[in-house]
Every structure is written in C-alpha cells, then in structure tokens.
C-alpha cells in the first residue's frame, strides 16, 4: 500500500560539513559540542549558528549523527556534563532500509512517496499528473517502473546498441572519476542507497541483464542521483553527471528515431551514410540560412520544422524550416546552387545512396559478404562442370550423325563431324578415316584430303572462338577475385603499417616527453639545491648577526643596575647589592624586608 513518509530531513551537503567538523574536533582530542561545531561551521562554511543548530538536530533525528552526554576532563568545563556529537558507525540495517532516502527527481529530503516495486521515492510535487497517487489504499508504481514495464526488446540487438552508448559514457566518466572522491568513503553508503557507476553499467550490458532501454536509462539517472546527493547540486561533479545523463538520453532518442542510422553512424563502415534504412528516409534539398540547397535525409518532422542530416563529409544535422525544403526530384538548375567541391561530393554520395536503393542493397557485415563470395564461387564452379557435361554428349551425338549419313556431300555434316572431333581430341583418327572412306566412292583420292583440310580449318575457328569466350569469362572471374583479394591484402598491410607507425610515433613521443620531463626535473633539482644552499648561507649569516646583537645587549644589560623592588633601571644606591629606581620603591622594600638585612652603615 502506498504511503507518504519522511525518510530524511537534513540537507546532504550540510551533513557532510557537520561530519567534517565533528571529525576535526575529535582529532584534536576535544568534545565535539554545539559551541565548537557552530564556530567551525561559521568560520569555514559561513553558516549561521541557528542554521547549524537546526541542521544538527535534523541530522540527529535522521540517525546520521549520534548525540551523547559527555563529562569534560580538562579546561574550564572539567567535570561538567555536556552534549557531545559522534559520527555514526559503518553498520547499516539494510533489511529496514529498503528504499532510498531522497527524491529520485530533485534529490532532496522531505515527505516522499514510496514505490511498491523498487527502491525509488518521489515527492508528490515532483510527479506529473499521470503518476500522482490517486488513492492511498492502492499500490503505487514510480515512473521508472512503469516505463520499464512497457517495452521489452531483443536482448542481443539491444546489447549491440547499448555498447556504443556505454563507450561514450566511459569517455565522460573519466572526467567524473578525476573530479570525484572515492566511493569507498566511510560515510558514502549513509547517503547513497544504491551505488552504481559506469563500469557496473558496462558489466550489466556485457552480461545482457538489461531488459529494456528504459532500465538502462534508469541506471544512468541513478548515477546522476547519487552524484548530486554526495557532491551537491552545484558541484563540478554534478555538472559532469548531468551532461553524462543528457548525452545518454540523446543517444537513446537517436536510437529510437532510427536504429539503422544509429548503428551505422557508430560502426562507421565504408560509405555508411549511403546504405538505405528500414524504412527509407525521405530525400530532400534543404537550405540553411546563409547557404544554398544541399542534399539531405529527413530524420523527423515537428510542426513547421524538419530535422535533416546532410550528405557530404561531416553529415551534419540541423532543424530547417519547411519552406526551405524542396523535394529531391526538383531540377538542380531551378535551385541556383553554387557547385563547390563539397556540394559535388555530397551529390556523388546521394547518387550512390539512390543506386543502393534501386538495387535493394543494405549494409552487411564482413562475414556475410565472405559467405556470399564463397557461395558465388561454388555456384560458378558447379556451372562450369555442368557446361562440360553438356558438351560431351553433344560431341557424341555429332559422331552418331556422321556415321548414319556418310554419303552426303554437303559441307555442314562434315563440318559438324570435324568440329565434334575437335571437342574430343582423344579420337581424331577414326573420324578422319570415316570422312575419307565416304568420299572415295564419288570423288578422287585428292578431293577428300582438300575437303578435310577446309572443314578442319573452319572447325578450328569455331572451337577457338568458343574456347576464347569460355576462358575469357574464367579469366575475368579470376581477375576480379584477385583484385578483391589484393584490395583486402593491401588494406590489411596499410592498416598494419599505420598501426606500427602509430605505435612507433607514440613510443617516440613518450620517450621525448620522458626526456623533457627528466631534463626539466634535473634543472628543477639543481636550482632547488642551489636555492637551498643560498638560503642556508643567509640563515647562518642572520643567526650570527642576531647572536652578536644579543651578546651586545646582554653586555649592556649587565653593566646597568636595576631596582630590587620593581626591576626597572635603578638610580639610588642603598647597599652592596640593593638599588632603587625611586624613593617609593625604596620605602616599600625597606618596610617590607630590607631594614632587617641592610648592610649600609648608618
């Protein structure tokens, strides 16, 4: 059942200041009473004594500071019982602390509404109308739990996208870790209920623990929540965490806008902007203020504004008024554009994108391309084998025709018989005997030889043409494969050379930096040593001067006589070791004791 309750009341930043005050006072072996804490807070943090007293009482109620009665053992309050304050222990009863202590939206204490499914709490004023509690007897779910409950995505696909976002978060988190304190601070868990950091988020992404994008976004918001609580809303760490959360929300919005664009813009394969998305983006001519019309993709439309991403080198985004948008089918000459090199490159990229659209060509990974190449090569080899098998029966059929019709004098059957014999070069002699024997019945012995030679020449030409086409095709296929292999090998060699060159440059840079640092350190050490010796010499000289002055002053002091009563310089001599500065001192000392011990002759 949902209920409103006060989990905490004291300000988190004031609590940390009070903790520091108590710790410093205790380290000085003193009782951390209200007076000492108030003076410290006023001197260091400029907090008014009344505000210090109020925050201290709230912290005691919240259990963040322990109040005890302590008896003073020294000073003006020795033996007096007084209130003393201590830091709480490290032990926390997590069975009772099931929910956070501060509003997940504004990160402040006060009367909060507790979620029935998670640890989050909210102020009623921080909730929108749709999430506010309608009936106190009903169960209440926070906005985060409701958003997580709405969607469930493919975990494998979601993990791929979230890895890109986490890599961006790690870059920002470097600054956050540099500016922040260690999360292992002894009082950290007293303020932060559910600790989370970027490495934890990355680990959950790698293990596939997120069920939706909203759950991932909730962890990013939790990181901001913890940072604001521990470091303060106006701290530099909180500004970095807000920027980190804002960037994460922007990345998630871009992902929901178009998953294909999000993946390709992060993976960055060759010609990544040219591959079509599903569904396809509308292509337009867009005109920014101060520029001409430029080819672009429409990402989204809102009221009278169009969000476009331009073709070209940088692929920039911009919101363009709808009146500055023209359909891509509009003739370029009507747009009066300045055809610069950048504009031409953008148009070339547009043409490649349109060609990919016509061909239905979508981006595929290298493994898929390699599988397709292997399939194509196996299909081509199978087709070549089938071509050979179909040619052999044709040759046998030619021989059969030749033996059935041996008496015909037309050149076609003989040409067919000879060409068939050229297709099967292992049996030339039987064909030649058959042709000669058939021709001897009608012609002389010389005629068959001439006819055979002519048909042999004709068949050679036909066979040569067929073989030329066949091997030209095979050679072209082999040439294309060699080109692709050479291109991949060249890219690999260039990539390895670049990596090697980069590593060598980094090594040289590191050595140069180390050398410069060592040289600078040597100069600093040498100058520091010289300065130290100079200061030591000056110190010795100064000590000598002071010693001489001191000796001279002592000598001058010894040569003077001093009043026995008030120790001022004496003017009146009484006896061998007694003098006075005035008659008053002489009378006071005389009546007090000197009249009994004076050795002056009367």
Curated annotation (Swiss-Prot):
It is found in: Nucleus; Chromosome. The modification Phosphoserine is found at residue 421. Changing residue 310 to A: Abolished H3.3K36me3 binding. The keyword Zinc-finger applies. Residues 149-255 form the Bromo domain. There is a cross-link at residues 366, 407-408 (Glycyl lysine isopeptide (Lys-Gly) (interchain with G-Cter in SUMO2)). Pfam families: Bromodomain, MYND_ZMYND11_ZMYD8, PWWP, SAMD1_WH, ZMYND11_CC. Changing residue 251 to A: Impaired H3.3K36me3 binding. PROSITE patterns: BROMODOMAIN_2 (PS50014), PWWP (PS50812), SAMD1_WH (PS52014), ZF_MYND_1 (PS01360), ZF_MYND_2 (PS50865), ZF_PHD_1 (PS01359), ZF_PHD_2 (PS50016). Homooligomer; forms homooligomers via its C-terminus. Interacts with histone H3.3 trimethylated at 'Lys-36' (H3.3K36me3). Interacts (via MYND-type zinc finger) with NCOR1. Interacts (via MYND-type zinc finger) with MGA protein (via PXLXP motif). Interacts (via MYND-type zinc finger) with EZH2. Interacts with EMSY and E2F6. Interacts with PIAS1 and UBE2I. Chromatin reader that specifically recognizes and binds histone H3.3 trimethylated at 'Lys-36' (H3.3K36me3) and regulates RNA polymerase II elongation. Does not bind other histone H3 subtypes (H3.1 or H3.2). Colocalizes with highly expressed genes and functions as a transcription corepressor by modulating RNA polymerase II at the elongation stage. Binds non-specifically to dsDNA. Acts as a tumor-suppressor by repressing a transcriptional program essential for tumor cell growth. This is Zinc finger MYND domain-containing protein 11.
